[in-house]
Design a protein with these regions (language model features):
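RNA substrate-binding interface of SAM-dependent RNA methyltransferases
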Residues: 97-174
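Short active-site oxyanion
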Residues: 22-25, 42-45, 62-63, 130-132, ...
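Boundary-proximal intrinsically disordered activation/regulatory segments immediately upstream
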Residues: 1-54, 138-139
């Protein structure tokens, strides 16, 4: 099946937060990142080159489209497309605040650069931190640049957007 213009338009629309939020999805690109996320998030659809698909015959994704490198480059948000891209469903962000008392967590206030947030998530993953609490003004975790910069850490570190003063006040009750 060829990649339709509507699907390309949809993928490219996921660069905008309002579109990601409306459909509760996010975009991931590249063999390592997509490979890491496949085991952690539900995949809506996957687009890949025949080379990548032949190396990953075990896929359980229902909606898979085989494309040429040229077709992939039309859909990709990257300057240099990397064999595969996938659209995943965003997980539920609810959390029991008592998790803070049982584990090391981070709180981030007003981080604006997607690459910086992705790097923080990647480092948190390396140190075994499972939860990051972000102020509402922090950049969207599902921004394609953030997802790319996490290098898969987004699969293991959960981000929660909340009012940090309210979160800190609620900790006094724990």
């Amino acid at each position: 099946m060829a990649l339709s213009k509507n699907r390309i338009k949809y993928i490219r629309s996921l660069e905008l937060k309002k579109n990601r939020k409306a459909d509760k999805v996010f975009l991931a690109e590249g063999p390592k990142l997509v490979g890491d996320l496949l085991g952690h998030f539900r995949c809506r659809f996957l687009i890949a080159t025949s080379e990548w698909l032949s190396a990953h015959r075990h896929l359980t994704v229902e909606d898979v489209t085989e494309v040429s490198e040229e077709e992939l480059s039309r859909a990709s948000l990257l300057k240099t497309p990397q064999q595969v891209l996938a659209v995943f469903e965003q997980p539920d962000e609810s959390v029991d605040v008592s998790v803070i008392s049982r584990s090391l967590c981070l709180a981030l206030d007003d981080v604006q650069d997607p690459g910086n947030l992705g790097t923080i998530i990647r480092l948190a993953d390396w140190f075994g931190i499972e939860h990051i609490f972000c102020s509402p003004n922090t950049v969207d975790v599902y921004n394609p640049k953030t997802v790319q910069a996490t290098m898969g850490g987004i699969a293991r570190v959960k981000l929660h957007y909340t009012s940090l003063p309210e979160l800190i006040a609620s900790l006094e009750d724990i």
